[in-house]
């Protein structure tokens, strides 16, 4: 590809910027008003805790329906994301940097002494910008950390669906594309069905919100996790029946281990005395779970990693 053409493809247009801002606005507004299970987060060092409205699945369904209606009425193109993928990538990257700058400035100026908003600085500008200043910064009552990871997961689905439609329009739909889309939909739907599990993850509990998390959530997740779909759009790969069965078996084996292990971890963090496989949990160092799937975590993680090759 010509370098000039490549650079032009990465240059955000006003359309791509509007698409991005519209998407984030939708998540902010409807994420605040749609009903959902309110889940308490971990108890922080000052004894306080945040509460999270887990309505991501409803947000997903509503957005897909709205986009479907918009496409049916010719108000928008279902391939708009696939057509402007590089533009949206660069626009989101710039957006993540701008958000991080605001978080850094606001965090440094904060005099709040609560666990969520107390500034944590090292004196190293790059380190503080990268790892963040505040644990749980908010904007107009919106918990930004929870918001961004939701945006990344849902954005991944939207990219995939747009690529799928483009593949159909170009008569380039393959068994590999169908399997990839199916596996991703299962994983993403599972995430939102069990969205409350996110409240007990290290990212939410302990990581401050800086460029590492902002970039990871809204750039890395949607744009790198969808690489397989982009590749299959231009490279039609047909599979034998045996290959399809093998891919499905490995995927579902990895998925079941992943889901079971993460459920055990979530239950343990919420209640350290909860039974794991009918037995009291074994713990290493007071915090590390060594029951259920977790004594075999190395093998389990390896299986899950191998299952990722099926995508």
What are these regions (language model features)?
Residues 1-294, 298, 304-310:
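Membrane-anchoring alpha-helices and their flanking helix-loop junctions
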């Amino acid at each position: 590809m010509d370098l000039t053409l490549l650079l032009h493809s990465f240059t955000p247009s006003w359309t791509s910027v509007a698409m991005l801002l519209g998407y984030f606005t939708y998540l902010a507004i409807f994420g605040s008003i749609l009903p959902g299970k309110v889940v308490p987060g971990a108890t922080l060092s000052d004894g306080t805790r945040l509460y999270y409205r887990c309505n991501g699945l409803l947000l997903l369904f509503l957005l897909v329906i709205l986009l479907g209606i918009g496409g049916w009425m010719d108000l928008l193109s279902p391939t708009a994301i696939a057509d402007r993928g590089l533009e949206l990538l660069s626009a989101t990257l710039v957006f993540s940097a701008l958000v991080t700058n605001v978080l850094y400035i606001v965090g440094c100026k904060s005099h709040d002494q609560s666990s969520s908003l107390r500034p944590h600085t090292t004196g190293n500008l790059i380190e503080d910008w990268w790892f963040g200043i505040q644990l749980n910064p908010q904007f107009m009552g919106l918990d930004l950390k929870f918001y961004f990871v939701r945006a990344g997961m849902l954005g991944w689905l939207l990219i995939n669906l747009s690529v799928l439609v483009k593949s159909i329009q170009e008569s380039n739909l393959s068994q590999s594309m169908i399997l990839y889309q199916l596996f991703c939909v299962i994983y993403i739907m599972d995430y939102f069905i069990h969205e409350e599990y996110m409240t007990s993850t290290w990212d939410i509990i302990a990581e401050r919100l800086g460029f590492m998390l902002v970039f990871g959530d809204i750039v890395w997740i949607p744009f790198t996790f969808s690489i397989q779909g982009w590749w299959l759009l231009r490279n039609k790969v047909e599979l034998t029946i045996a290959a399809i069965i093998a891919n499905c078996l490995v995927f579902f084996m990895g998925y079941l281990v992943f889901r079971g292990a993460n459920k055990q971890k979530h239950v343990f963090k919420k209640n350290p005395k909860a039974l794991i496989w009918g037995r009291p949990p074994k713990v290493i160092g007071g915090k590390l779970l060594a029951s259920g799937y977790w004594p075999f975590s190395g093998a389990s993680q390896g299986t899950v990693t191998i299952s990722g090759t099926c995508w």
